[in-house]
């Protein structure tokens, strides 16, 4: 390995270790805190009925005309998000642990290349500020998690009030799948000026946006498209 390759390897592995440490810390912290959902007005922030700014029902389904797959979507504030991770079979994408059932459960894992061409017509890759707005809208609450797919979480605590159904599908480093049931990461289409891209990271009771160590060449993450 040359010095650049070694530095990248160390940075990426530090990132993976840090992700695991954050999960462990937050699990301990959450055991000492109370439910943060007091005063959260689900009906106004992410209503299940009515129509959104696009004239669509606030929650519904659409079909990706490329392969006929149907996806759920949900409205959160002024944003409309896919309520399932993308499962379009693009070159280089794969299922967690290479098991087709995991593509059905979590969607596909993608390299951070040609991201702007992966979402269905009428949808686009989110930027980091799209996820920032999401965090502000839901007040960093975990009402976007799907119950039954997270370790160390009681199904009675978080009930996916906003319908976004985030599942702990982990990620992949090169071809090695990691962290299922613990966390999940999603690509944005936004670079930090190098070949590192910002990602949206979710772990149990913690969400963040960062570009540290998220190389488009080695890391594989999921995609949630947002309505254009």
Locate each region found by the language model:
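Hydrophobic alpha-helical segments with strong N-terminal bias
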Residues: 14-15, 95
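General secondary-structure edge motif
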Residues: 12-13, 205
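Conserved positions within compact, well-structured domain cores
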Residues: 35-228
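N-terminal secretory signal peptides that target proteins for export/translocation
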Residues: 1-12
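C-terminal motif of bacterial Sec signal peptides marking the signal peptidase cleavage site
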Residues: 28-31
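Conserved active-site regions of diverse hydrolases
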Residues: 25
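Sec-dependent signal peptide recognition
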Residues: 15-22
